[in-house]
Every structure is written in C-alpha cells, then in structure tokens.
C-alpha cells in the first residue's frame, strides 16, 4: 500500500476572510512548518481571490469592493501570524481561537487553526476548524483544498474528494487540488483512469516540471503496482 508522504511545499496564500486580493510575494514553505495566511481580511460574502500556483506569475485580480474590517481583528490576526512564523504555536493557537470566537464570519482564523491542528496530529479538530473556514468563506478555493487534505488524513476519502472537486470548480487554474485529487484517486479510491487524467492535467498546468508526478503517471500507464511511491498533498 502506498502512503501520501512526499514533501511538497505549502504555499502561503490563504486569506483571513477568504476574499481579498493576494498581497505580497508568494512564498513556499516546507510542510513541516505551519503555513501562515496572508494579511488581507474581508467579510465572507465577498468574492474569492484567484489562487496562484508555485512557479506561476501572479495574475492581476479583478477589483473587489470590501466592507470595512475591524482594525482590532486585523491587529490580532497580524500578531497571530507573527507567532506562527516564529514557531510560537501555543501563542498562535490561543490568538486564532480568540479570533474565531470574536469574528466567526472570517474564514482565515478557522483555516489557520485547522492547519495548526493537522500538523499537531489533531485530525478531528483540524477537519472541524476547516469546515468552519469553508462555511465562513465558501468561495475560497484554498480553504476547500486544505479541508480536503485534512479529511484525507482522517480517512474521510469521499469527503476529501468533494472538497478537492469544489476547490477545482472555484478556481480551474489552481493546480494543487488537481494533484491532490489525483493522489486520492490513485492511492485511496482505486480509480487509476481518473488518477492518470488528473496527473496529466496537473503536469499540463505546471509545465510538466514535476518529475515525481510524471513518474507516477508513467507507472499508471504501464500498470506497475509493485513500484511504490510516497506522495504528499499540496496546499
């Protein structure tokens, strides 16, 4: 049996409210590090920002009219991000929990809390937090992708498929859930044809530069189940 353990980078692209334009340079961080979200915040009913895949140039986003945001919430969120980046996870968790209670309509704190829980091995808590993130910001593809990762880790494979498919529906140019859905079909749903289709799609989206994914696709084409690979979802 194959396991999803290949170390692919997480991308720091999640938004606090799940709906503003992405700010700053896209920064890839190793999946051993909790991924902080971007600083921009907005209420859950605004439109989702387009996601940017690692290696792609950022595309100009359509302007979005944002409702005023509580400056105290932004300040608290910035402090939580600083704690995450500094590795002070207990402090970050406390701050994020406080934000989810004072501003439950903002998806970002829920999403960050879910990532923090997942990396601490608290999968039920991670899934619950990320479900709240997508409920607060249902148009944010990145939150759905993160939810799928936690659901897959928790053994909720059909729910993970739904989450990845929703992320793809929301942003057809977002490559990470395409790969994650391919891995899910390959390793857990036993749908080789669908997995191969998704691997090929991912490689087309990313310029075919991922040698490991190309190898997985070749294995499926050649029907060599004895060749075991380890794989890891992308954020």
Predicted regions and their residues:
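Alpha-helical segment of the N-proximal tetratricopeptide repeat
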Residues: 66-106, 115, 119
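Structural marker of alpha-solenoid helical repeat scaffolds
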Residues: 102, 136, 170-171, 204-206
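Bacterial signal peptide processing site
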Residues: 20-23
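Terminal, low-structured helical/coil segments at or just beyond the last alpha-helical repeat
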Residues: 27-28, 187-235
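Position-specific recognition of the canonical hydrophobic site in helix A of tetratricopeptide repeat
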Residues: 84, 111, 118, 145, ...
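Helix-start (N-cap) detector for alpha-helical repeat units in TPR-like alpha-solenoids
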Residues: 73, 107-108, 141-142, 175-176, ...
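Canonical tetratricopeptide repeat
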Residues: 112, 146, 180, 215-216
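Structural signature of tandem alpha-helical TPR/SEL1-like repeats
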Residues: 86-98, 119-132, 154-166, 189-198, ...
């Amino acid at each position: 049996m194959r396991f999803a353990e290949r170390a692919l980078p997480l991308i720091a692209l999640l938004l606090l409210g799940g709906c503003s334009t992405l700010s700053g340079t896209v920064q890839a961080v190793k999946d051993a590090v909790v991924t902080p979200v971007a600083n921009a915040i907005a209420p859950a009913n605004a439109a989702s920002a387009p996601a940017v895949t690692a290696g792609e140039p950022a595309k100009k986003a359509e302007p979005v009219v944002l409702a005023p945001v509580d400056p105290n919430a932004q300040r608290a969120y910035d402090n939580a991000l600083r704690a995450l980046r500094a590795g002070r996870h207990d402090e970050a968790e406390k701050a994020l929990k406080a934000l989810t209670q004072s501003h439950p309509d903002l998806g970002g704190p829920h999403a960050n809390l879910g990532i923090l829980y997942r990396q601490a091995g608290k999968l039920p808590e991670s899934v619950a937090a990320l479900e709240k993130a997508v409920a607060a910001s249902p148009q944010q593809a990145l939150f759905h992708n993160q939810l799928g990762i936690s659901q897959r880790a928790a053994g909720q494979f059909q729910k993970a498929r739904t989450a990845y498919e929703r992320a793809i529906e929301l942003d057809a140019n977002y490559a990470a859930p395409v790969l994650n859905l391919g891995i899910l079909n390959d390793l857990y749903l036993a749908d080789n044809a669908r997995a191969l289709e998704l691997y090929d799609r991912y490689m087309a989206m990313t310029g075919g530069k991922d040698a490991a994914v190309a190898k997985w696709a070749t294995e499926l084409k050649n029907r060599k189940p004895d060749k075991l690979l380890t794989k890891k979802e992308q954020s």
